[in-house]
UniProtKB/Swiss-Prot annotation:
CDD domains: ATP-synt_Fo_b. Keywords: ATP synthesis, Cell inner membrane, Cell membrane, CF(0), Hydrogen ion transport, Ion transport, Membrane, Transmembrane, Transmembrane helix, Transport. The keyword Transmembrane helix applies. It holds the Pfam family ATP-synt_B. It comes from the Bacteria. F-type ATPases have 2 components, F(1) - the catalytic core - and F(0) - the membrane proton channel. F(1) has five subunits: alpha(3), beta(3), gamma(1), delta(1), epsilon(1). F(0) has three main subunits: a(1), b(2) and c(10-14). The alpha and beta chains form an alternating ring which encloses part of the gamma chain. F(1) is attached to F(0) by a central stalk formed by the gamma and epsilon chains, while a peripheral stalk is formed by the delta and b chains. One of its GO terms (molecular function) is proton-transporting ATP synthase activity, rotational mechanism. Belongs to the ATPase B chain family. It is a single-pass membrane protein. InterPro entries: ATP_synth_B-like_membr_sf (IPR028987), ATP_synth_b/b'su_bac/chlpt (IPR002146), ATP_synth_F0_bsu_bac (IPR005864), ATP_synthase_B_chain (IPR050059). This is ATP synthase subunit b.
Length: 156
């Protein structure tokens, strides 16, 4: 191996080239690589953060959906209770109204029956007196007639 001036010149040129590259080419290249690494790392961190935010949002949405369902079920249950209460109140009111109408009808029937009885008593008394007049073939004076009718009405 012969070391000659060409090899020595090539070595010096190579060292200058390496120094030049290390001084002027390497730092911008390393800066670009580091910047790209930083952007990639930031992108991955943002992606991780976005995944966590998505999971949190899904969890919140699920919780809100559960709360909404529970609230809806509670409202439906209250509405059903209120419906049953209204139906019961309406039934009670209808029963009371029915009882009132029945009592009123019975009172009217009783009053009509008493009136008919009284009319019947008077007619029977009048017929009895008329029959007695016919049998006796005589007329009874008005005062006596009144007394007899009143007594017959009281007896009947």
């Amino acid at each position: 191996m012969n070391i000659n001036a060409t090899l020595l010149g090539q070595t010096v040129a190579f060292i200058i080239f390496v120094w030049f590259c290390m001084k002027f080419v390497w730092p911008p290249l390393m800066n670009a690589i580091e910047e790209r690494q930083k952007r990639i790392a930031d992108g991955l961190a943002d992606a991780d953060r976005a995944v966590k935010d998505l999971e949190l949002a899904q969890s919140k949405a699920t919780d809100q959906l559960k709360d909404a369902k529970a609230t809806a079920n509670e409202i439906i249950e209250q509405a059903n209770k209120r419906k049953a209460q209204i139906v019961d109140e309406a039934k009670a009111e209808a029963d009371a109204e029915r009882a009132k109408i029945i009592a009123q009808g019975q009172a009217e029937i009783e009053a009509e029956r008493n009136r008919v009885k009284e009319d019947l008593r008077k007619q029977v008394a009048t017929l009895a007196i008329y029959g007695a007049e016919k049998i006796l073939e005589r007329s009874i004076d008005e005062a006596a007639h009144s007394d007899i009718v009143n007594k017959l009405v009281a007896e009947l």
